[in-house]
Regions:
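Non-catalytic, polymerase-adjacent accessory regions of viral genome-replication enzymes
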Residues: 1-144
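Short amphipathic alpha-helical segments at helix boundaries and their inter-helical linkers
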Residues: 56-59, 142-159, 258-272
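Nucleic-acid processing machinery
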Residues: 106, 110-111, 117, 148-161
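Short, hydrophobic/amphipathic alpha-helical packing segments
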Residues: 117, 181, 314-318
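Glycine/proline-rich, flexible active-site/cofactor-binding loop segments
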Residues: 158-200, 272-297, 304
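Active-site-proximal segment of RNA-dependent polymerases
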Residues: 177-230, 259
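Conserved polymerase palm-domain catalytic core
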Residues: 215-335, 340-361, 365-368, 374-377, ...
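A conserved non-catalytic segment of reverse transcriptases
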Residues: 361-414
Length: 460
């Protein structure tokens, strides 16, 4: 018999006994004795540790954290030492039935109607799946993300060029998994409020609201987080779902449905192609190490649930940066991976030290600042955040306006087909969205562009 495996099995039985017990030391001790077939001296130490860690001897408080309790018991020195004593060696003699329950939801949810998903069966039924099918989609059996031919791979991959050079990997879920992620987003995640400094991926907030609070400031500091989505590990996503009241087993499945391990072949092929373009065979080890985070479970950029999950998992980052900003007398907002700070001349004078503190806080929360994208913009320069000019008031960049104006003019003169150079499936809606965004920043210019948009003859 392997003691660690046996210890885990017995610890689960003890956890069930405590979950079924009233919150009373004597009755909890009686339940443990029934589970083990006899009382034991080392149970006193275990009970004391449980009370100190979970704030209860038994009952609802422990039932809601049943799996965490089992893991805690399995690691207690007094429990493990008992395996070495032939007279006190634990074994299970009695079994208590246990029905997992949802934990208490955070008060911040304001009584929102979260789905009650206490078991894997509940989650499977909610997603209209069988339990084995749920395991398949959640990647429960996956331990190696290396093979593209892996039958549990529910993603397709697309490389797109970044605006400033390099390539970005989009990990796009296939249809059925995407539908599940969308339901998790719509019926669970949208109820959870992010930090007030976060302006991306939430209702009534936008790139404009992110930028507007920084208008008319003497100094604006723009910073960027490198690889924002992949920097959010699965353990942080699991902790979020657990904090929402989902039992550990359900939180684990929800995490599996929303996180992904990139097959190494995807990255190997891209690095080999890049090396070939540069005229040498193979690829260097440093480039491979730069992609190491993709080989662990992370939020995939391309999944509908990832932006909101990343926002929520960055909550503590926002708390710390907002506190830093308040202490320094500056304003802070975040739009996805874009950080913005603004204030008076004092911010410019102390900017080097301020940047170091921001980078240290980000590193402590698992993120890295991209130093090449850090810019201090004074009032005498063009101050721009997420495409919005904020020198005096939120406004559109003149070159953005002129570029869109030229596209609309060419569409009206030569037809829209030749202007859709990116092959967008709904070019008309794309242009309408750009015009509407510009109109929010500059109504007069927006009205002129709206007239140009209306003059385009669209094919039936």
């Amino acid at each position: 018999m392997n003691p660690p495996t046996e210890a885990e099995r017995i610890a689960r039985g003890m956890a069930r006994a405590l979950a079924a017990s009233p919150d009373d030391r004597a009755q909890a001790r009686e339940h443990l004795a029934r589970a083990l077939g006899r009382d034991a001296r080392w149970l006193t130490t275990v009970q004391r540790a449980v009370r100190q860690r979970f704030g209860a001897y038994g009952g609802e408080a422990l039932a809601a954290r049943h799996e965490e309790l089992a893991g805690f018991l399995a690691r207690r020195p007094a429990f493990l030492e008992a395996f070495e004593n032939i007279h006190e060696r634990p074994y299970l003699a009695g079994y208590f039935t246990f029905h997992p329950r949802m934990g208490a939801a955070p008060l911040a949810l304001g009584g929102a109607a979260m789905p009650a998903l206490a078991t894997a069966g509940d989650l499977a039924a909610w997603l209209k799946l069988g339990v084995e099918e749920l395991d398949w989609f959640a990647g429960v059996r996956v331990r190696d993300g290396r093979r593209l031919a892996e039958p549990l791979n529910h993603y397709r991959y697309q490389w797109v060029p970044k605006a400033n050079g390099g390539m970005r990997l989009l990990e796009i879920p296939k249809r059925r998994l995407k539908q599940m992620q969308r339901r998790i987003l719509d019926e669970i995640l949208y109820f959870v409020p992010p930090h007030e400094a976060a302006h991306g991926f939430r209702p009534r907030h936008s790139a404009l609201t992110h930028a507007a609070g920084h208008a008319g400031r003497a100094a604006v500091l723009r910073m960027d987080l490198r690889n924002f989505f992949v920097s959010v590990p699965a353990r942080r996503v699991h902790a979020l779902f657990a904090a929402l009241g989902f039992p550990a087993s359900v939180a684990r499945l929800l995490t599996g449905l929303t996180c992904h391990i990139t097959p190494k072949a995807v990255l190997r092929e891209q690095l080999a192609a890049r090396a070939a373009d540069r005229g040498y065979r193979g690829y260097d080890a440093a480039a491979w190490r730069n992609w190491s985070a993709w080989f662990a479970p992370h939020l995939p950029q391309g999944a509908p649930s990832s932006p909101v999950l990343a926002n929520l998992c960055a909550f503590n980052l926002d708390v710390r940066l907002a506190a830093l900003a308040e202490d320094a007398g500056v304003h802070y907002t975040r739009y996805a991976d874009d950080l913005a700070f603004s204030g008076e001349r004092a911010l410019a004078r102390g900017v080097e030290g301020f940047k170091r503190i921001v980078a240290t806080i980000a590193a402590g929360e698992g993120f890295a600042v991209n130093a090449r994208k850090t810019h201090l913009m004074l009032r005498s320069q063009r101050q721009q955040l997420t495409g919005v000019v904020v020198n005096a008031r939120p406004n559109v960049r003149r070159d953005d306006y002129e570029r869109l104006k030229a596209i609309l003019h060419n569409c009206a003169r030569h037809g829209p087909a030749g202007q859709n150079r990116e092959g967008l499936p709904d070019f008309r809606a794309h242009l309408a969205g750009r015009v509407a965004h510009l109109a929010r920043l500059n109504p007069a210019r927006g009205a002129r562009l709206a007239r140009s948009l209306a003059a385009i003859a669209w094919p039936d």
